[in-house]
């Protein structure tokens, strides 16, 4: 009887290694997806500007992302998260090779959570400004600027997509690392 129990345990080990390796490969793929999302968001927001044409050369109205500190924070936050994700790729590759690495997975869970908080703060702050740009605020007497600066508003709205997508991917990465640790 003891032999069959040992036999069952040894046949389970290759299966666990295969699942752990699969989780590590998925982790690497998700990191690449998050890199693309944060990089695209930072570039889209960082290159956004629009100048309204007027009849005179002396009066021009211009909208740039750098006019609003919140949008600048959005670009910086996405850039930091993108840099972190690029720097975490080697660790993710190590997990494919050595799926038993425990400390590095714990480190990634912690740092992924910090980066999730950073990208959430940046995206949420930018989303509030984008909402005000589209709708304005009657009580504060803030007019909606998107009727005049339509391409500016389209770009800043579109840049939020990659950032919110990266938030979802970071949540999945944290869950994936937690599952991989729990399987130990």
UniProtKB/Swiss-Prot annotation:
Listed Pfam families: CASP_dom
Subcellular location: Cell membrane
Membrane topology (UniProt): Multi-pass membrane protein
Gene Ontology biological process terms from the UniProt entry: cell wall organization
Stored InterPro entries: CASP/CASPL, CASP_dom, CASPL
Cytoplasmic side: 1-24, 94-105, 181-184
Any Gene Ontology CC annotation: plasma membrane
Glycosylation sites: 49
Intervals, Extracellular compartment: 46-72, 127-159
Major site of localization recorded for this protein: membrane
Keywords for this protein: Cell membrane, Cell wall biogenesis/degradation, Glycoprotein, Membrane, Transmembrane, Transmembrane helix
Spans through the membrane: 25-45, 73-93, 106-126, 160-180
Record note on quaternary structure: Homodimer and heterodimers.
Function, as annotated: Regulates membrane-cell wall junctions and localized cell wall deposition. Required for establishment of the Casparian strip membrane domain (CSD) and the subsequent formation of Casparian strips, a cell wall modification of the root endodermis that determines an apoplastic barrier between the intraorganismal apoplasm and the extraorganismal apoplasm and prevents lateral diffusion.
Family to which this protein belongs: Belongs to the Casparian strip membrane proteins (CASP) family.
NCBIfam families linked to this entry: A_tha_TIGR01569
Protein name: Casparian strip membrane protein 1
């Amino acid at each position: 009887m003891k032999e069959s129990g040992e036999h069952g345990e040894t046949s389970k080990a290759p299966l666990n290694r295969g699942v752990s390796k699969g989780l590590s490969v998925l982790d690497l793929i998700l990191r690449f997806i998050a890199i693309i999302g944060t990089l695209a968001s930072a570039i889209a927001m960082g290159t956004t500007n629009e100048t309204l044409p007027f009849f005179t050369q002396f009066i021009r109205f211009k909208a740039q992302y750098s006019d609003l500190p919140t949008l600048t924070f959005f670009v910086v936050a996405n850039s930091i998260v993108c840099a972190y994700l690029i720097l975490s790729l080697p660790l993710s590759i190590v997990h494919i090779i050595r799926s038993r690495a425990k400390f590095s997975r714990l480190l990634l869970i912690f740092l992924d959570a910090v980066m999730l908080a950073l990208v959430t703060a940046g995206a949420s702050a930018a989303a509030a400004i984008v909402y005000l740009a589209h709708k304005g605020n009657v009580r504060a007497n803030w007019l909606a600027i998107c009727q005049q600066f339509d391409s500016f508003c389209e770009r800043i709205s579109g840049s939020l997509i990659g950032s919110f997508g990266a938030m979802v991917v970071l949540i999945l990465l944290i869950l994936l690392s937690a599952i991989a640790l729990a399987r130990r």
